[in-house]
Amino acid sequence: MQTEVQKLTNAKAIITYLAEKFPLCFVLEGEAKPLKIGLFQDLAEALQDDERVSKTQLRQALRQYTSNWRYLYGCREGAVRVDLQGNPAGVLDAEHVAHAAQQLAEAKARFAEKRAAAKKAQQKKHPRKPANKNLKKESKLSLSAVDFSQISVGSVVKVKAGDNAKKATVVEVLKDSARVELENGLIMNVAADRLFA
């Protein structure tokens, strides 16, 4: 009885598989280490009996891994290349460091262009409305405090709510507050310091 092996189809799944199989060489999080020159051949030999990955898929996954920003960040002066087992396999030369820096700069520029285009498209979809300059400037509220001892049921007062004052009618006078009914029908308890004439 033979079990069917599930083939890995996308590059991301293949990279995850490589990171599981060769954890000292491939990393999924953090800074990636520069890979040994000719690592593809080593990988092809190590995985030749593995039915999950074809050479073409392996090449595509390796291309994606080495063009990732994390990998390009790791390719800096003095960085040491690693083989499949994580052993040192030579230091990056200046030419490769410069190439990685150029690739990273180009990738960032493409990303910035794409982001700017998406932002522009979003703005076209939902343009910002200009401020209405015809709105009246509201003057500061000039409210005079009401003598709480003079308030009785039926008195018309103003209730301060934030920066606004609403007209209200006193429904009940309590010890240090009053129950009022706003013009919209809402009944609420209001502290004496929030009532004005």
UniProtKB/Swiss-Prot annotation:
Residues 117-131 have a biased composition (Basic residues). GO terms for molecular function: RNA strand annealing activity; RNA strand-exchange activity. It comes from Haemophilus influenzae (strain ATCC 51907 / DSM 11121 / KW20 / Rd). Gene3D superfamilies: ProQ/FinO domain. The lineage of its organism: Bacteria, Pseudomonadati, Pseudomonadota, Gammaproteobacteria, Pasteurellales. The gene is proQ. One of its GO terms (cellular component) is cytosol. PANTHER family: RNA CHAPERONE PROQ (PTHR38106:SF1). One of its GO terms (biological process) is post-transcriptional regulation of gene expression. Signal peptide: none annotated. It comes from the Bacteria. RNA chaperone with significant RNA binding, RNA strand exchange and RNA duplexing activities. Residues 115-138 are annotated as: Disordered. Keywords: Chaperone, Cytoplasm, RNA-binding. Coiled coil: none annotated. This is RNA chaperone ProQ.
